[in-house]
């Protein structure tokens, strides 16, 4: 789209699993430009499906690093062809799919610092990587390395207290350990290891960008309290790892000015600042403008909770990261697998496949459901690890079935009580100023949101998050420009469009759920102990 009056702006990038996307946001925080490149469609020569290669073992999942480089070439050329005015860009930042790692070959820094504006990036960087297909977040091939890492630091809980999460197969430290063990030659030829986020930032900087605290928290390597690499974790993964990673930086740091390559080839101003890139989940927290005490609930195929925490309590479930917009605070992520598909199943079975009847069932049943509680996990749940359907009546006796309308309320109340219990297990507390931001498919259903407001005893707002990682990256660019750690993020984004109020707690809700929540938690423990057998 051609530009008319010049608009000073910041760019927000997102290097996600299936595409690279960019938005331009002006000083009034309006998104006025967006563009994207879809890997499968626009770069078919790499042969990806959903942006990745799934290997024969079904566990190893990688993406070609040059595909990401070429996607950046294409998107910049598209912007140039559309008449985008690069001279107005004050700063840029971005997001990357979390946990993925890129291995720069010895000598790559030299190539990055001496890019010729006459050639595209991928023509100049094709020999710069010691691993051409990089492990990404969908990879689950590192179980052995996870066990080694946990053993090295005294167990899963000890690792979680140190790094914010127990060992997960997709987390970067375990992926690095696998590469060192299986491909020691490639590892020894690697001079720098980047996350997808810091790799993308390096392309814009024309030199290696540091890893930021927030995305660095998804590696099982960063001590989240001290914001330094854990020597015990580094040593358990691979030798000489600290020098290949370099020290991490606060997420709002200006890491440098844009490379002269972009000034000469595209017309960026030489003073355009690059603000540290971060992970896509932390960038989404920025895009949704979460503040202290807030919680975001994404109600999709799986349900995800984003929490803003002051005093985290790392556990064997969920993930705690350094907060991307306030380095003194934290954020947590909790994933629940049984989301919208479970809601659809119960709708189909209980209320004749109709969402309006589903809503009527919620309206016609009382808060607390007369003490009837249910757990609905048709696929093995992550939080907690339970499968199956479990229903309990007022006396806490297991029952085989509920009437249709009771079943609907038991499902929705149960899903939200589980979210509150597990959030509080990580140190989250509902505050008087707490807002809940709801996104995803079920956020269009007013009655579902009413139950959410009642269970958490907090107002629920709905927000459009189609580009939340991109928009959050542009907001973070403005934040870095304004002085980062010295200026509250909320001050920088106060002009952004406000979310819409969708539900407020019903009178008496807090008393009902204060009584039910401990009961629900006890029943969850009961099911867990029955499915696991007695503790060892």
From Swiss-Prot:
Superkingdom of the organism of origin: Eukaryota
Gene3D superfamilies (alphabetical): 3.30.420.40
Enzymatic reactions: D-xylulose + ATP = D-xylulose 5-phosphate + ADP + H(+)
GO-annotated molecular function: ATP binding; D-xylulokinase activity
Pfam families in UniProt: FGGY_C (PF02782), FGGY_N (PF00370)
Annotated positions binding substrate: 99, 170, 280-281
Primary enzyme class: transferase
GO cellular component, one term: cytosol
CDD domains: ASKHA_NBD_FGGY_SpXK-like
GO BP term (any one): xylulose metabolic process
EC number of this enzyme: 2.7.1.17
Residues that bind ATP: 355, 441-442, 445
Keywords attached to this entry: ATP-binding, Carbohydrate metabolism, Kinase, Nucleotide-binding, Transferase, Xylose metabolism
Annotated function: Phosphorylates D-xylulose to produce D-xylulose 5-phosphate, a molecule that may play an important role in the regulation of glucose metabolism and lipogenesis.
Family note: Belongs to the FGGY kinase family.
Subunit structure: Monomer.
Protein name: Xylulose kinase
Biological source species: Homo sapiens
């Amino acid at each position: 789209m051609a530009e008319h009056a010049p608009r000073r702006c910041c760019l927000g990038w997102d290097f996600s699993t299936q595409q690279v996307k960019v938005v331009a946001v002006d000083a009034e925080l309006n998104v006025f430009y967006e563009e994207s490149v879809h890997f499968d469609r626009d770069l078919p020569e790499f042969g990806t499906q959903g942006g990745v290669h799934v290997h024969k073992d079904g566990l190893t999942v990688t993406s070609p690093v040059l595909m990401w480089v070429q996607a950046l070439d294409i998107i910049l050329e598209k912007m140039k062809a559309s008449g985008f005015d690069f001279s107005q860009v004050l700063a840029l930042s971005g997001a990357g799919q979390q946990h993925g790692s890129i291995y720069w070959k010895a000598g790559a820094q030299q190539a990055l610092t001496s890019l010729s504006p006459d050639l595209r990036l991928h023509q100049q960087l094709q020999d710069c990587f010691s691993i051409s297909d990089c492990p990404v977040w969908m990879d689950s091939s590192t179980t052995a390395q996870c066990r080694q890492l946990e053993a090295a630091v005294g167990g899963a809980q000890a690792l979680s207290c140190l790094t914010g999460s127990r060992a997960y197969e997709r987390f970067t430290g375990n992926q690095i350990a696998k590469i060192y063990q299986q491909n020691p030659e490639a590892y020894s030829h690697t001079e720098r290891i980047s996350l997808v986020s810091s790799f993308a930032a390096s392309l814009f900087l024309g030199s290696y960008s540091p890893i930021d605290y927030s995305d660095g928290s998804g590696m099982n390597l960063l001590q989240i309290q001290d914001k330094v690499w854990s020597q015990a974790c580094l040593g358990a993964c691979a030798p000489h790892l600290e020098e290949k990673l370099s020290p991490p930086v606060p997420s709002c740091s200006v890491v440098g000015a844009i490379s002269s390559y972009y000034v000469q080839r595209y017309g960026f101003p030489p003073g355009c600042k690059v603000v540290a890139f971060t992970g896509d989940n932390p960038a989404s927290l920025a895009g949704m403008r979460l503040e202290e005490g807030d919680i975001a609930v994404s109600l999709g195929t799986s349900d995800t909770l984003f929490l803003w925490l002051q005093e985290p309590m790392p556990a064997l479930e969920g993930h705690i990261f350094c907060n991307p917009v306030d380095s003194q605070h934290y954020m947590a992520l909790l994933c629940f697998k049984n989301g919208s598909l479970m809601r659809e199943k119960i709708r189909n079975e209980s209320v004749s496949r109709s969402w309006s009847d589903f809503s009527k069932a919620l309206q016609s049943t009382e808060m607390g459901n007369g003490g009837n509680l249910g757990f609905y996990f048709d696929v093995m749940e992550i939080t907690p690890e339970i499968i199956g359907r479990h229903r309990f009546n007022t006396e806490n006796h297991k029952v085989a079935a509920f009437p249709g309308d009771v079943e609907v309320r038991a499902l929705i109340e149960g899903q939200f009580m589980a979210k509150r219990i597990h959030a509080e297990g990580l140190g989250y507390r509902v505050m008087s100023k707490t807002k809940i931001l709801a996104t995803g498919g079920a956020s269009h259903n007013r009655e579902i949101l009413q139950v959410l407001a009642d269970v958490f005893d907090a107002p629920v707002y709905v927000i459009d998050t189609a580009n939340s990682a991109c928009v959050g990256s542009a907001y973070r660019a403005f934040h870095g420009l304004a002085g980062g750690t010295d200026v509250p993020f909320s001050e920088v984004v106060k002009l952004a469009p406000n979310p819409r109020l969708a539900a407020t707690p019903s009178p008496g809700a807090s008393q009902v759920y204060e009584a039910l929540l401990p009961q629900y938690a006890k029943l969850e423990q009961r099911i867990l102990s029955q499915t696991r057998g007695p503790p060892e």
